[in-house]
A protein has these predicted regions:
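Leu/Val/Ala/Ile-rich N-terminal alpha-helices, chiefly Sec-type signal peptides and the beginnings
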Residues: 1-49
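Short, charged, low-complexity loops and linkers
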Residues: 9-18, 79-90
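Short, flexible helical or helix-coil boundary motifs
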Residues: 14, 60-64, 147
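Residue-level recognition of alpha-helical structural elements
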Residues: 19, 23, 45, 49, ...
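Charged, amphipathic alpha-helical oligomerization/scaffolding segments
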Residues: 22-36, 55, 59-62, 94-104, ...
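Alpha-helical segments in soluble extracytoplasmic regions
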Residues: 42-78
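Short, charged/polar, low-complexity loop and linker segments
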Residues: 74-87, 108-117
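Preference for long, well-ordered alpha-helical segments
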Residues: 101, 105-164
Length: 164
């Protein structure tokens, strides 16, 4: 499944989450997707972005691993369905938005948590989502100089004035 479509599924699932375990599960799913997208970009992207892409993959792994992994549910791990990144800049912008939404949802869960362990679990998940989002933003910041290569174009973009 294409990355933007998977991200959309994740955003809808997060919006429909009714309680803390559902939100934590969606945070975990988002981090697993960040890991998968970072890995794919590291393998297939331009060499100059591979270090940043690996950092995204590692940040996603930290946020989707550990002893506090929620039960994934009947749908399984969505990131395992990733078959292509598609339009890389759009996929990264959407992933960044998803990770931002996850952070906001986790803040709400943490503020309502009465159990200290659950509170700190939320705080760790917030930090992980923020770190992954920072990595996405860094890749996006550097991506425009590689945009033509990422879309398979080797000349001026259609409609640009530099072709004259």
């Amino acid at each position: 499944m294409e990355a933007v479509r998977l991200i959309g599924v994740g955003r809808r699932a997060l919006a429909q989450s009714q309680d803390a375990p559902d939100i934590m599960r969606e945070a975990w799913q988002a981090q697993a997707l960040a890991q998968a997208m970072g890995s794919r970009l590291a393998m297939l992207g331009p060499p100059e972005l591979r270090g940043d892409a690996l950092s995204l993959s590692e940040a996603g792994a930290r946020g989707s691993g550990g002893s506090a992994v929620p039960v994934v549910g009947a749908g399984g791990i969505r990131a395992a369905q990733l078959t292509e990144l598609g339009e890389v800049d759009r996929a990264l912008r959407e992933l960044g938005a998803l990770l931002g939404d996850v952070g906001i949802a986790l803040v709400a869960v943490a503020s309502e948590s009465f159990e200290e362990g659950a509170y700190w679990q939320c705080m760790e998940a917030i930090d992980a989502a923020d770190e992954s989002r920072d990595r996405v933003l860094e890749i996006l910041r550097r991506l425009p100089e590689h945009d033509d290569r990422m879309h398979g174009r080797h000349g001026p973009a259609p409609g640009s004035d530099s072709a004259a």
